[in-house]
């Protein structure tokens, strides 16, 4: 069942944990692609020097961060890789959760082709293990790009997140990745992942 807006109307720190184990879905050319969310990071604009909206920054690029909970914020890093985030809490407060890694569940053949431009039978074991183990990788595998920016994940669109409460797991809290510039914020334990899951980006 698709997650509705009330789920996202909490702090990014809460939602980042709640999203672990949930299922990220995208429909691509009639094929359903699904992956279990196994790693997330929380960003809180007001107090977080790692956030694009730190200090109330409002540029055209970051305005989606101020959107209503349950909408997508998709941006480019290094000019070539997309990152997919979900807006949380309340409209106007710039809180969001970065989806860092997923465990492929359905439509894996299509994911492999999107990632490597060849059939799954022709990719190596290393390539398969790296299919969705990072924010840019999962966006390629699920065909998420800037066209999904500001998309409402709670309506009838092709991109959304489903409930999945069948699995029990431990959550590891750690420092976020790649934000060495963020002064004291680089030490916040705002990265969360499922303990011992092989699909996380790094331990």
Swiss-Prot record:
Pfam families, A to Z: Pur_DNA_glyco
- CDD domains linked: AAG
Q: Which SUPFAM superfamilies match?
A: FMT C-terminal domain-like
One Gene Ontology biological process: base-excision repair
Q: Which domain of life is it from?
A: Bacteria
A GO term for molecular function: DNA binding
Which Gene3D superfamilies does its entry note?
Methylpurine-DNA glycosylase (MPG)
**InterPro entries per record:** Formyl_transferase-like_C_sf, MPG, MPG_sf
EC number assigned by the record:
3.2.2.-
Keywords assigned by UniProt, alphabetized? DNA damage, DNA repair, Hydrolase
EC top class, as a word: hydrolase
Q: Which family does it belong to?
A: Belongs to the DNA glycosylase MPG family.
HAMAP family the UniProt entry points to? 3MGH
Which protein, by its recorded name, is this?
Putative 3-methyladenine DNA glycosylase
Organism name = Clostridium tetani (strain Massachusetts / E88)
Its taxonomic path starts at: Bacteria, Bacillati, Bacillota, Clostridia, Eubacteriales
């Amino acid at each position: 069942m698709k997650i509705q807006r009330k789920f996202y109307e909490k702090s990014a720190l809460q939602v980042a944990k709640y999203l672990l184990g949930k299922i990220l879905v995208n429909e691509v050319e009639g094929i359903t692609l699904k992956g279990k969310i196994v790693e997330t990071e929380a960003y809180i604009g007001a107090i977080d020097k790692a956030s694009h909206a730190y200090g109330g920054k409002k540029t055209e690029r970051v305005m989606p961060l101020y959107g209503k909970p349950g909408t997508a914020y998709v941006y480019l890093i290094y000019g070539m890789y997309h990152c997919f985030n979900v807006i949380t809490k309340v409209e106007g407060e710039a809180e969001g959760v970065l989806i860092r890694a997923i465990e492929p569940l359905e439509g894996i053949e299509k994911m492999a082709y999107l990632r490597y431009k060849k059939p799954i039978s022709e990719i190596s074991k290393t390539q398969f293990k790296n299919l969705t183990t990072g924010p840019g990788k999962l966006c390629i595998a699920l065909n998420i790009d800037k066209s999904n920016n500001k998309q409402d994940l709670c309506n009838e669109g092709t991109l959304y997140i489903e409930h999945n409460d069948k699995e029990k797991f431990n959550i590891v809290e750690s420092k976020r990745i790649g934000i060495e510039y963020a002064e004291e914020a680089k030490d916040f334990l705002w990265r969360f992942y499922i303990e011992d899951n092989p699909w996380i980006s790094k331990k």
